């Protein structure tokens, strides 16, 4: 049974204009995600950061709490399987979290569906 659906669209250029990207990265990405970001550069790094931010926004909408007191960016971790498919590997929901990420040059859109009993 579907518990919740969340969708988000984010402008990638917004991340290029960050005044303190290190602080923002530490707030949004887990240690494992930060290590993966370190291996990327240029446009691909911005797409990665925007994509992970957007997934976490979508997840918070599907979960029904938004980001804040009950759920923060560090509670959600995105990884990729052997085929490059995004997977939400760490999250508070007891069921399954399905995720889709798509981006163009300037935007990323994500959708999260939470499924449980």
UniProtKB/Swiss-Prot annotation:
Catalytic activity: apo-[ACP] + CoA = holo-[ACP] + adenosine 3',5'-bisphosphate + H(+)
Region forming the signal peptide: none
The EC number(s) this enzyme carries: 2.7.8.7
Record-level GO cellular component terms: cytosol
Superkingdom per UniProt: Bacteria
GO-annotated molecular function: holo-[acyl-carrier-protein] synthase activity; magnesium ion binding
Broad class of where this protein is predominantly found: cytoplasm
Binding-site residues, Mg(2+): 8, 57
Any GO BP: lysine biosynthetic process via aminoadipic acid
Cofactor(s), by name: Mg(2+)
Task of the protein: Transfers the 4'-phosphopantetheine moiety from coenzyme A to a Ser of acyl-carrier-protein.
Annotated family: Belongs to the P-Pant transferase superfamily. AcpS family.
Protein name: Holo-[acyl-carrier-protein] synthase
Gene from which the chain derives: acpS
């Amino acid at each position: 049974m579907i518990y919740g659906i969340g969708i988000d669209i984010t402008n990638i250029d917004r991340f290029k204009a960050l005044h303190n990207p290190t602080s923002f990265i530490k707030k949004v990405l887990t240690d494992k995600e930060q290590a993966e970001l370190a291996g990327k550069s240029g446009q691909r790094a911005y797409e990665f950061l925007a994509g992970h931010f957007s997934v976490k926004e979508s997840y918070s909408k599907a979960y029904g709490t938004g980001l804040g007191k009950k759920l923060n960016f560090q509670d959600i971790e995105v990884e990729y399987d052997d085929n490059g498919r995004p997977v939400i590997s760490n999250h508070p929901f007891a069921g399954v979290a399905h995720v889709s990420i798509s981006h163009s040059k300037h935007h990323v859109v994500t959708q999260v569906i939470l499924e449980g009993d």
